[in-house]
Design a protein with these regions (language model features):
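Acidic, Mg2+-coordinating active-site environments of NTP-dependent enzymes
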Residues: 64-126
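Hydrophobic anchor at the start of a short beta-strand
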Residues: 2, 43-44, 121-122
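Short gly/ser/thr-rich secondary-structure transition/capping motifs
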Residues: 24-27, 46-52, 83-87, 124-125
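Acidic/polar active-site rim loop that often engages polyanionic ligands
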Residues: 9-17, 65-72
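Conserved helix/coil segment N-terminal to the catalytic DExD/H
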Residues: 51-59
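Conserved nucleotide-sensing/catalytic segment adjacent to the nucleotide-binding pocket
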Residues: 16-49
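Local beta-strand N-terminus motif with an aromatic residue
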Residues: 1, 41, 63-64, 99
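Short beta-strand-centered segment that lines the nucleotide-binding/catalytic pocket of NTP-utilizing
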Residues: 1-14, 49
Length: 126
């Protein structure tokens, strides 16, 4: 069974919950991950926001992979500028372990940048 943590909802099995933040606060996030484990979830697909990275909401979690689709100017109200926003997103890929994968969209000009310091197995698409 798989789980989902996204902007739209949190779901696993037949359970569905509203989600109010793309990446919930660390306590809420771990509560749902624990419930998923108890329900038999083996994998969780999680949307990780730049806010979640910057505010350490995912600190301590070990990801088996990450997917970069694109960067837009969506969160410049929170981040000082586009470079800061991009660098925060890059921290996620920098933190992936060697055993993880990084799947990157090369159609986005920031794709290659995300891979620069990542030790994860690298895959690309365009």
């Amino acid at each position: 069974m798989t789980g989902l943590l996204s902007t739209v909802k949190i779901a696993y099995g037949y359970k569905k919950f509203e989600n109010y933040h793309t990446t919930p606060d660390a306590v809420t996030l771990n509560k749902y991950l624990h419930k998923m484990l108890d329900a038999g979830v083996s994998h969780c697909f999680m949307e990780v926001s730049s806010h979640g990275i910057d505010q350490n909401r995912i600190k301590g979690l070990v990801f088996s992979g990450g997917i970069f689709s694109n960067l837009t100017h969506d969160h410049l109200d929170y981040h000082q500028d586009f470079k800061t926003y991009r660098d925060v997103k890059k921290l996620f890929f920098d933190s992936l372990p060697k055993t993880a994968f990084a799947l990157i969209n090369l159609d986005d000009k920031n794709g290659k940048y995300m891979l620069q310091n990542s030790v994860a197995k690298k895959y690309t698409y365009a």
